[in-house]
């Protein structure tokens, strides 16, 4: 299994728009071949900070996800909302 965790910090006034955009991205991503799970969280104390937790069949599926049209569209739409570049970390499950 291959896991991807993305921390997304948007401008405080953009939290609602980001939540809508990210929710749509999650719904589309869950339909992809190789997607085991894809979850979105909003930080309780800081609602303009989001976390995705993605589980993919393998690294190839995660890489394919990044080249889909819906990811490209989401990145383009989210650009003006970002307060900082997203932190994206990939992990391989060991145990």
Label the model's feature ranges.
Residues 1-37, 43-50, 55-67, 83-95:
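Short S/T/G/P-rich N-terminal loop/turn motif that feeds into the first structured element of a domain
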């Amino acid at each position: 299994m291959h896991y991807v965790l993305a921390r997304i910090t948007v401008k405080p006034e953009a939290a609602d728009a980001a939540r809508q955009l990210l929710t749509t991205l999650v719904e589309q991503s869950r339909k992809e071949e190789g997607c085991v799970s894809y979850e979105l969280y909003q930080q309780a104390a800081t609602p303009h900070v989001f976390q995705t937790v993605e589980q993919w069949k393998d690294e190839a599926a995660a890489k394919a996800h990044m080249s889909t049209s819906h990811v490209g569209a989401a990145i383009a739409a989210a650009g003006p909302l970002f307060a900082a570049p997203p932190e994206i970390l990939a992990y391989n499950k060991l145990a």
